[in-house]
Curated annotation (Swiss-Prot):
Family per similarity comment: Belongs to the class-II aminoacyl-tRNA synthetase family. ProS type 1 subfamily.
Alphabetical list of InterPro entries matching this protein: aa-tRNA-synt_IIb, aa-tRNA-synth_II, aa-tRNA-synth_II/BPL/LPL, Anticodon-bd, Anticodon-bd_dom_sf, Pro-tRNA-ligase_IIa, Pro-tRNA-synth_IIa_bac-type, Pro-tRNA-Synthase_IIa_type1
Protein name: Proline--tRNA ligase
Taxonomy of the source species: Bacteria, Pseudomonadati, Pseudomonadota, Gammaproteobacteria, Enterobacterales
One Pfam family matching this protein: tRNA-synt_2b
Species for this entry: Escherichia coli O1:K1 / APEC
Length: 572
């Protein structure tokens, strides 16, 4: 490819609305342009990277025995009503109507469509197991699209769905997909972790996320410092303290705290250790409960884990925090003065709180706290559950080592769905015993566009993107200095361009009438791994300057050796 016949579209300045580095660099490198909130046009450089990612995904899915299909983006509402997700999915599901006012959705996912296909196409257990995948556009009406293609409304996704007649068969395919995903992200040169995860709105039982480690990540990834244990923080178990609860040394005292409405203010004003404080959060109770709210207690320096809390049988789903008005109607005090003593609604305390003594908490009276609270003396020990986020230094749930926490970007997710969708849509085959058998399902997703952004978050420097070789838009950049004035430089540039292309190498020849500084800046911004610079001064000595983008090292290579050298660097 020649720059004179290509849309480079690089920008010198960083757009003001680009928050994270991947969004900034994708705009500056001419990979994407914003059309509307959460909607992006992919420009040629971006498409080249996207296709590289797609090809790796497709190769490994095919190698794992999956079969490619292509399903419609627009889906009839009847399927979503049949599965029960028409009401459950929420406002992210974009509902539309055709000219006959028939309702449809723009698909955020394709469980319903593939299950409908399979229930009509398969009839016998002898046809199973089967695993189908597609690389297709998805649409989710995000309330706040941000971070460029990291959280956009329209995106490209590889989604796969497997069908089985036994849990054992599902487990085999699940393990094969786990291995395929590991190969996919390894081939792309990404630093990632496969972690245990919550199944969320997709449903099902077992689940793993594939997280690319990056400071800009939206997820907290938890892993042991000595074992293979890894989990999303939503799922990581907080082990109960091993030490028995210390004996009480203080009497419970009612203290005026008119200006302490948060744990931070309480700690600062009364010089309390934060580990001796408890915060109380009120959430809505499950429908049909005799109480409107449930009180959840965690230590002052810990955070409530909303995924764990939502799984409590007495808590409404989705988890909904009570408003101040709802709190005052039940407790007669504001949110900053809540605690377990004389709490008139059910209470659930975290395991760490259960091990505390002589602690401070709200008195359920505005502007007052109790200090020196002790369980079973001042208030009965309520229900105990794991409802907090783990913190760095906590013991690993597998009993090996302590936990580390890093930020991650979710780029893949695999689920064991079980029979959730096949039961709802009555997808069955004739079993070995001649009777109808409901199918067991798995589903496996990769955010293809998100992978591109995640790769940039791991691979950049002050000059631009530093692509892993496998997904770079071009493999080699040829920069001929003063090409339009030097016949020797022009002739050699054309010769090398042809020879490298003949070797199957993707080359970008910068044949613009531009200053050398602009040419260098653009190639480094785009992130092409290998650059060769042709100039009269070096050619006087039969030399070509070679630069490797990742480490910035330069070396002079003889003109006659440069093609073989590049082929060896790229193909090994």
């Amino acid at each position: 490819m020649r720059t004179s016949q290509y849309l480079l579209s690089t920008l010198k300045e960083t757009p003001a609305d680009a928050e994270v580095i991947s969004h900034q660099l994708m705009l500056r490198a001419g990979m994407i342009r914003k059309l509307a909130s959460g909607l992006y046009t992919w420009l040629p450089t971006g498409v080249r990277v996207l296709k590289k990612v797609e090809n790796i995904v497709r190769e490994e899915m095919n190698n794992a025995g999956a079969i490619e299909v292509l399903m419609p983006v627009v889906q009839p509402s009847e399927l979503w009503q049949e599965s029960g997700r028409w009401e459950q999915y929420g406002p992210e599901l974009l509902r539309i109507a055709d000219r006959g006012d028939r309702p449809f959705v723009l698909g955020p996912t394709h469980e319903e469509v593939i299950t409908d296909l399979i229930r009509n196409e398969l009839s016998s257990y002898k046809q199973l197991p089967l695993n189908f995948y597609q690389i297709q556009t998805k649409f989710r009406d995000e309330v706040r699209p941000r971070f460029g293609v990291m959280r956009s409304r329209e995106f490209l996704m590889k989604d796969a769905y497997s069908f089985h007649t036994s849990q054992e068969s599902l487990q085999e395919t699940y393990d094969a997909m786990y291995a395929a995903y590991s190969k996919i992200f390894s081939r792309m040169g990404l630093d990632f972790r496969a972690v245990q995860a919550d199944t969320g709105s997709i449903g099902g039982s077992a689940s793993h996320e594939f997280q690319v480690l990056a400071q800009s990540g939206e997820d907290d990834v938890v892993f042991s410092d000595t074992s293979d244990y890894a989990a999303n923080i939503e799922l990581a178990e907080a082990i109960a303290p091993k030490e028995p609860r210390a004996a009480a040394t203080q009497e419970m005292t009612l203290v005026d705290t008119p200006n302490a409405k948060t744990i931070a203010e309480l700690v600062e004003q009364f010089n309390l250790p934060i580990e001796k404080t408890v915060k109380t959060l009120l959430v809505k109770a499950v429908e049909g409960s005799s109480f409107p709210l449930v009180a959840l207690l965690v230590r002052g320096d810990h955070e409530l884990n909303e995924v764990k809390a939502e799984k409590l049988p007495q808590v409404a789903s989705p988890l909904t925090f009570a408003t101040e008005e709802e709190i005052r109607a039940v407790v007669k005090a504001g949110p900053g003065s809540l605690g377990p003593v004389n709490m008139p609604i059910p209470v659930v305390i975290d395991r760490t709180v259960a091990a505390m003594s002589d602690f401070a908490a709200g008195a359920n009276i505005d502007g007052k706290h109790y200090f020196g609270i002790n369980w079973d003396r001042d208030v009965a020990t309520p229900e105990i559950a794991d409802i907090r986020n783990v913190v760095a230094g906590d013991p690993s749930p597998d009993g090996q080592g302590t936990l580390l926490i890093k930020r991650g970007i979710e780029v893949g997710h695999i689920f064991q769905l079980g029979t959730k969708y096949s039961e709802a849509l009555k997808a069955s085959v004739q079993g070995e015993d001649g009777r109808n058998q409901i199918l067991t399902m798995g589903c496996y997703g990769i955010g293809v566009t998100r992978v591109v952004a995640a790769a940039i978050e791991q691979n950049y420097d002050e000059r631009g993107i530093v692509w892993p070789d496998a997904i770079a838009p071009f493999q080699v950049a040829i920069l001929p200095m003063n090409m339009h004035k030097s016949f020797r430089v022009q002739e050699l540039a054309e010769k090398l361009y042809s020879e490298l292309r003949a070797q199957g190498i993707e080359v970008l020849l910068d044949d613009r009438k531009e200053r050398p500084g602009v040419m260098f800046a653009d190639m480094e911004l785009i992130g092409i791994p290998h650059t060769i610079v042709l100039g009269d001064r070096n050619l006087d000595n039969d030399d070509i300057e070679y630069k490797y983008r990742r480490n910035g090292e330069k070396q002079l290579i003889k003109t006659g050796d440069i093609v073989d050298y590049l082929v060896k660097q790229i193909k090994g």
